[in-house]
Amino acid sequence: MELHNDEKRLLKAFQDSNKKIMNLEELSEYIEKEKVMRAAFWLSGRDFLEIIENKTRVCELTELGKNSLDSEIPERKVANYIKENNLESIPIKDLSKILEKDETGAALGNLKKKELVTIDKGNIVFKNLDYKDNEEEVLKKVSEDFNLSNYSEDEVKIIENLKKRGFLKINEVVDRSFELKSAGIDFIKNPIEIKEEITQLTREMIVSGKWNDYTIRPYDAKIPTEEIYPVKAHPMSKIIQEVNEVLISMGFKEVKSQIVQTEFWNFDTLFEPQDHPARDMQDTFFVKYPNTGIVPKDLLEKVKGIHECGTIGSEKISKGWCYKFDEKVSERTVLRTHTTVSSIKYLASLSETERENPQKVFCIDRVFRNETIDYKHLPEFYQCEGIVMAEDVNFDNLVGVLKEFLRKLGFEKVRIRPAYFPFTEPSLEAEVYMEGKGWLELLGAGVFRPEVLEPFGIKKPVLAWGIGLSRLAMLRLGLTDIRELHKNDIEWLKKTAVSEK
C-alpha cells in the first residue's frame, strides 16, 4: 500500500518515539501541526490508527467578567457605596449614579434574589453590608482554573448563572490523541523511507532526468472525501418522468383531463351504478362550487339506457343494473377519483375515421380520494393509467403489454391474478416479486366491457390498466410509510439515489 509522505512522517513519529499513543503536541514536533489531522484522517481511513477525542467544557471570562474581577461586581459596588458614605440605604433611582445603565436592573434583581436587601418606600436597605458572595468567589476561581470538570455541582450552577449575566462564556475544547492500530504497528516495524513527492512533471525534469529523483504521487480514488449532494429532482418527480418515458418508448401518447369532473364522466361512463359505495361522501370529494357541470345530452341518454336496462335505443347490450338512473346525480361535480376519465374522454372525442385506427394513450396525473391519512393512504396521490384499442387485441395482449411495461420499470418477475372491477371483464391484478419482500400487488387491469364502449360507438376491444405511482415509489425507495414521500426531509432527499431501479 502506497502512503502519502505526510502519512509516513506521522508513522515515523511513532517509530522514533517508540510510543503507541501520541497527542497533537507530541506529533507536531515531527510534522507541521496543520498536517497532523489531515494525515491522521487518511491513516484512520486505512485502519492504521484511531483518532481518540476527549471533549472538555471550559470557562472563559468575558470583558465584563474581567472588569468585575478587577473592580467589583455590580451588587458589591452598591454595598460599598452605602458603606463608604455611611448611609443606611439608597433610593433605587440613585443606582444610576453608581452603576452603568445596563447594570442597574440586573444588580437590583440579584440583590433581591440573594435576599441581601429589602425595599422600603423606594429605598434599598442592605441586611448586611459585609456579606459573602459565592458568585465573586467562583468568578475569581474561574480566572485561575478554566476546566469545568474541576468544579462542584453547586459551583457549576453558579457558573451557569454567571454565564447568563454575561460575566463568562462556556466553550467545548476537544483534545485529540492518536493510537496505533495493528496495521500501523506492523508498518513501523520496518524502516520508513520518505522520498520527496511531486504531483506533476515539468519539461525541465524530463530533459534533465531529475524526475528519477522524485516519487510521483499516485491518485487514490478510494480515499475518504466529503460527500457532495448535487441538485436533483424529487424522487417522486423522477419516477413520474421515468414512467412517462417508458410509455412513450412503447408507442403510447399522453393525454390529460381536468381535475374537476362530473359524476357522469367519473362514474357513469364506466358503468358504475349510482348507488355504488365508491360514490359515497366517505370515498369521494364533492365540489361545493360549482356543484354541477354540463353533461352531453346525447351521451347521457345512451349511458342512462345502459345503466337502467342494458340497451342503447333498441339494441340490447346486457341486463344493465336494473335501477332508476338519476340525471341530476350525473351533473354533480367531484374531484376525479382516477385518471381513467382521461382515456374515456379521449375515446369519446374520436371521430369515426379515428375509431378505425389503433389507439394507445396514457395519463399520469393527480387523483383524489376521501381517505383517512395513514401509512398507506393519502387523500391525494399520483396515478397512471393507459389503454390500447385495436381490432384483434385480447386478454393475452394485455398481459404482454403489462409484463413489458413492468420489465422496463425494473421488475423481472411478474404474475397475474384474477380480479374484479365494474368496468372491465375479464379483469386482473399484476403482482411483482421483490427480494426480501416477496410478491406485491402493483396494478389492476382488464378489458373494457361493452357497456363502457357502446355509448361512444366503439366496437373494437379496448385494454385498460392503472397503477398508483405512490405505491411504485414506496417499493422503489424502500419506504414503509407513504407520508415519507411528502415530508420534504432534506437529509432523506439529499441521500436518496437519483435512480433506484
Swiss-Prot record:
Co-factor(s): Mg(2+)
A GO biological process held by the record: phenylalanyl-tRNA aminoacylation
Keywords assigned: Aminoacyl-tRNA synthetase, ATP-binding, Cytoplasm, Ligase, Magnesium, Metal-binding, Nucleotide-binding, Protein biosynthesis
SUPFAM superfamilies: Class II aaRS and biotin synthetases
Residues binding L-phenylalanine: T340, F423, F448
Record's GO cellular component terms: cytoplasm
Binding annotation for Mg(2+): E425
Family per record: Belongs to the class-II aminoacyl-tRNA synthetase family. Phe-tRNA synthetase alpha subunit type 2 subfamily.
Protein name stated in the entry: Phenylalanine--tRNA ligase alpha subunit
Protein source organism: Methanococcus maripaludis (strain C7 / ATCC BAA-1331)
